[in-house]
Amino acid sequence: RRQSAPSSDSAWKWVEWNVVVMIAARMHSTRLPGKALLDIEGKPALLHLLSRLRRASVPKAVVLCTSTHPDDQVLQPLAEQAGVGFFAGSEDDVMQRFLDAAEREQAEHVVRVTGDDLLVDPAYLDRLVLHHIREGAEYSCMPGLPKGMECEAVSVEALKKAKRLAEDSSWSEYMTWYLKVPEVFR
């Protein structure tokens, strides 16, 4: 779907973005396995998050990004039920998974959300993206939000640069930590 910035920000009203929200989720959490399917008010936890993210105005798409591990395929019906995209990629390299999904979606910018950040506010997500684009940032976040509401915006070019600079993919699950180095990324 094609979207423009929220009408409350008239200077950006007719600008269309090539931004995709990507949710990193899997079934093999070490602290709480299967947390994506935990029941909250009669629905899986992840379905609540996907439904919230669909209410954001600025991104052109929302994609659930998981791994090719057979156990993670149970997440695809949730993506379909929520009306969002689904992508299964590298099991061990989350950064590569996001890059592959971004390529498929032809995204210029990605908003990274983890599957356990169930309370991401679509309005804050939109504000984050607008700030990210206005500032020409490679990486943006909204510090100070309570746990569970966090999301991060990153240009696909910066993500590619981080991938090239990475010595190994073992830290890939925490891919945006490296992007927080101001001497390397804006």
State what each model feature region is:
Residues 80-93, 103:
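Conserved donor nucleotide-binding strand/loop of the catalytic core
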Residues 92, 117-119:
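Acidic metal-phosphate-binding loop of nucleotide-sugar-dependent transferases
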Residues 140-154:
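Short beta-strand-to-loop element that shapes/binds the nucleotide-sugar donor at the catalytic cleft/hinge
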Residues 57-86:
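Acidic donor-binding segment of Leloir-type glycosyltransferases
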Residues 157-186:
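Active-site oxyanion/phosphate-handling segment shared across diverse enzymes
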Residues 122-144:
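Conserved donor-nucleotide/metal-binding helix-loop-beta segment in metal-dependent transferases, i.e.
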Residues 17-66:
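N-terminal glycine-rich phosphate-binding loop and ensuing alpha1 helix
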Residues 110-111:
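Short aromatic/hydrophobic "clamp" motif used to bind/position activated sugar donors
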